């Protein structure tokens, strides 16, 4: 389950930010996760609760915001939102697409005290 290692990375970031900015508790942590990032949300939620024990984020509410998949179409030259990596271009129907977004994962923000 790679969600556990993702949460370990998040914990490291939270602990670093707590030291830098002097907060003791994270109330809410918001993640932006791309549609194609390959992250199982339920597994991430479980791993988050386990990995954050004993940290500033213990008991924090995890909010996941899904970012859309995006691709550049080589047929029409436009960038468009796609639901699946193998979808045709929604603008022209072309099949030559290069994904340009939707595989990212980042901490958007945290509510702290």
From Swiss-Prot:
Protein's organism: Cereibacter sphaeroides (Rhodobacter sphaeroides)
Q: Where are the transmembrane segments?
A: none
Keyword annotations of the record? Metal-binding, Nickel, Zinc
Traced from the root, the source organism's taxonomic lineage reads:
Bacteria, Pseudomonadati, Pseudomonadota, Alphaproteobacteria, Rhodobacterales
Example of a GO biological process term: protein maturation
Family as reported in the entry's similarity comment: Belongs to the HypA/HybF family.
KW Zinc (keyword) present: yes
Which one Pfam family would you cite for this protein? HypA
Q: Which residues form a coiled coil?
A: none
Function, please? Involved in the maturation of [NiFe] hydrogenases. Required for nickel insertion into the metal center of the hydrogenase.
List GO molecular-function terms, semicolon-separated: nickel cation binding; zinc ion binding
Identify the residues that bind Ni(2+). 2
Q: Which NCBIfam families match?
A: hypA
Sites binding Zn(2+) sit at 73, 76, 89, 92
Q: Which InterPro entries match?
A: Hydgase_Ni_incorp_HypA/HybF_CS, HypA/HybF
Q: What is this protein called?
A: Hydrogenase maturation factor HypA
Q: Which domain of life is it from?
A: Bacteria
